[in-house]
């Protein structure tokens, strides 16, 4: 099995401007992500960015980069532009790794690619168990429920499944049936081409979760429990400080 990792790295960020170039132990954040992807055994790693400064930083680190349009509405649209420009075939496996995950375990990058290769779904992703009620009720922690074969039934910012009997008594404890979705995806390139041809769905606009477009149009998403739990991603200056601390002490 071979696969390509594409790392969308948008320069603009309301909470952390220039995020892909944030320095972490002497390297731009996006370069750390690129290194994790290479460690996974990917045949090819491409950073997709809308900013020439990110392009320069990746090239200086010896990486491959595609300068994309700046008007994409999502990382998946940016991914689709790269797929078309590089001429990937419909059966090629593409893994989308977020550009703000410098601590992502390389093992789960390979895991999601292998899961897709073994599945008939056009798309695969990962999740981890939720262990605290705080996380279960946090709308920023996206929950996913699956069917018996590991295909997604729904993703939500709400607490799903709703434990009616337990929560009628107390919301301080939870059972072991909650999963938090991780923002890593594997697709067949042809699936991405179909995805971007679909109009946005009502559900994704309500929840602000673009993967709901896939379920809306009747397609399957394979979900597995990740072999390793990723550490914090970088959305804020506080996140960046935590990641710098973790990497400085490795």
UniProtKB/Swiss-Prot annotation:
<dbReference type="InterPro" id="IPR029044">
    <property type="entry name" value="Nucleotide-diphossugar_trans"/>
</dbReference>
<keyword id="KW-0963">Cytoplasm</keyword>
<dbReference type="GO" id="GO:0009103">
    <property type="term" value="P:lipopolysaccharide biosynthetic process"/>
</dbReference>
<comment type="similarity">
    <text>Belongs to the KdsB family.</text>
</comment>
<keyword id="KW-0448">Lipopolysaccharide biosynthesis</keyword>
<dbReference type="GO" id="GO:0005829">
    <property type="term" value="C:cytosol"/>
</dbReference>
<dbReference type="Pfam" id="PF02348">
    <property type="entry name" value="CTP_transf_3"/>
</dbReference>
<comment type="pathway">
    <text>Bacterial outer membrane biogenesis; lipopolysaccharide biosynthesis.</text>
</comment>
<dbReference type="InterPro" id="IPR004528">
    <property type="entry name" value="KdsB"/>
</dbReference>
<protein>
    <recommendedName>
        <fullName>3-deoxy-manno-octulosonate cytidylyltransferase</fullName>
        <ecNumber>2.7.7.38</ecNumber>
    </recommendedName>
</protein>
<comment type="pathway">
    <text>Nucleotide-sugar biosynthesis; CMP-3-deoxy-D-manno-octulosonate biosynthesis; CMP-3-deoxy-D-manno-octulosonate from 3-deoxy-D-manno-octulosonate and CTP: step 1/1.</text>
</comment>
<dbReference type="GO" id="GO:0008690">
    <property type="term" value="F:3-deoxy-manno-octulosonate cytidylyltransferase activity"/>
</dbReference>
<comment type="function">
    <text>Activates KDO (a required 8-carbon sugar) for incorporation into bacterial lipopolysaccharide in Gram-negative bacteria.</text>
</comment>
<dbReference type="GO" id="GO:0033468">
    <property type="term" value="P:CMP-keto-3-deoxy-D-manno-octulosonic acid biosynthetic process"/>
</dbReference>
<keyword id="KW-0808">Transferase</keyword>
<keyword id="KW-0548">Nucleotidyltransferase</keyword>
<dbReference type="InterPro" id="IPR003329">
    <property type="entry name" value="Cytidylyl_trans"/>
</dbReference>
């Amino acid at each position: 099995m071979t696969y390509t990792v594409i790392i969308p790295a948008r320069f603009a960020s309301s909470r952390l401007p220039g995020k892909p170039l944030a320095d972490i132990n002497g390297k731009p954040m996006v370069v750390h992500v690129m290194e994790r992807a290479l460690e996974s055994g990917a045949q090819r790693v491409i950073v997709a960015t809308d900013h020439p400064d990110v392009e320069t930083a990746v090239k200086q680190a010896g990486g491959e980069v595609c300068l994309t349009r700046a008007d994409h509405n999502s990382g998946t649209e940016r991914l689709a532009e790269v797929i078309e420009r590089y001429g990937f075939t419909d059966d090629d496996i593409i893994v989308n790794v977020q550009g703000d995950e410098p601590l992502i375990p390389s093992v789960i990058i390979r895991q999601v690619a292998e899961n897709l290769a073994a599945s008939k779904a056009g798309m695969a992703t990962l999740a981890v168990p939720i262990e605290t009620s705080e996380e279960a009720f946090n709308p920023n922690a996206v929950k996913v429920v699956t069917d018996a074969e590991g295909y997604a039934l729904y993703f939500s910012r709400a607490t799903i499944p709703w434990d009616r009997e337990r929560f009628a008594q107390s919301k301080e404890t939870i059972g072991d049936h909650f999963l938090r979705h991780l923002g890593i995806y594997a697709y067949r390139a042809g699936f991405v081409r179909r995805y971007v041809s679909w109009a946005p769905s009502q559900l994704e606009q309500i929840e602000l979760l673009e993967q709901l477009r896939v379920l809306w149009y009747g397609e399957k998403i394979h979900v597995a429990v990740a072999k390793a739990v990723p550490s914090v991603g970088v959305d804020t200056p506080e996140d960046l400080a935590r990641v710098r601390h973790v990497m400085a002490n490795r």
